[in-house]
Curated annotation (Swiss-Prot):
GO terms for molecular function: ribosome binding. The keyword Cytoplasm applies. It comes from Maricaulis maris (strain MCS10) (Caulobacter maris). It comes from the Bacteria. This is Ribosome maturation factor RimM.
């Protein structure tokens, strides 16, 4: 998989066509989801302009977007799954302890003691806050989730490429995977 250039931030993705006029349903990953459409043209992973948002309206699970480029329903549907990037320079300055999800992907995850805990595969939000999907944990198959809160993620260093976590006992462990965990009292 090709990684975006450092000056690009993955901000949205096309979920499919909407209607017959070439509008697309778009999932935004911006902190304020509507902001994804105010940063100018969307770029592909190589920095080439692919779509320019003209109008966006909120709908369940995303936005319906009309683009300046002429699209019909078939062209809009063919774009399903397309990742949309914007220039980092177009985005607002981040506060301390704020991160773009795309900057976190692929970082090494370690415990408080520095022991390797895997790699960050994805950041999800199913409505109750961000969850980190961690994969490659030693002695564990598959991936597991951890809430992205200061309690469980006390330190992130983009510069060092490391996320330090303090998961609850048995989260991310072999015991959790096997359905074990704390015995019932």
């Amino acid at each position: 998989m090709t990684e975006p250039a450092d000056d690009l931030v993955f901000i949205a993705a096309i979920a499919g066509a909407h209607g017959v006029r070439g509008e697309c349903k778009v999932k935004s990953f911006a902190g304020n989801p509507a902001d994804a459409f105010k940063y100018g043209a969307f770029l592909d992973i190589d920095g080439k302009t692919i779509l320019t948002p003209k109008a966006a309206r909120p709908v369940k699970d995303g936005f319906v977007v009309r683009f300046a480029e002429p699209l019909d329903r078939d062209k809009a549907q063919a774009l399903k799954g397309t990742k949309l990037h914007v220039l980092r320079s177009a985005l607002p300055e981040l506060e301390e302890d704020e991160f773009y999800h795309s900057d976190l992907l692929g970082l090494k995850v370690q415990g408080l003691d520095g022991a390797p805990m895997g790699t960050l595969k994805a950041v999800h939000n199913f409505g109750s806050g961000d969850l980190l999907e961690i994969t490659g944990t030693p002695d564990r198959n598959g991936s597991w989730m951890l809430p992205f809160t200061r309690e469980f993620v006390p330190h992130v260093s983009i510069a060092e490429g490391v996320i330090t976590i303090d998961p609850p006992e048995d989260v991310g462990s072999k015991a959790e995977e096997e359905g074990g965990g704390a015995p019932d009292d």
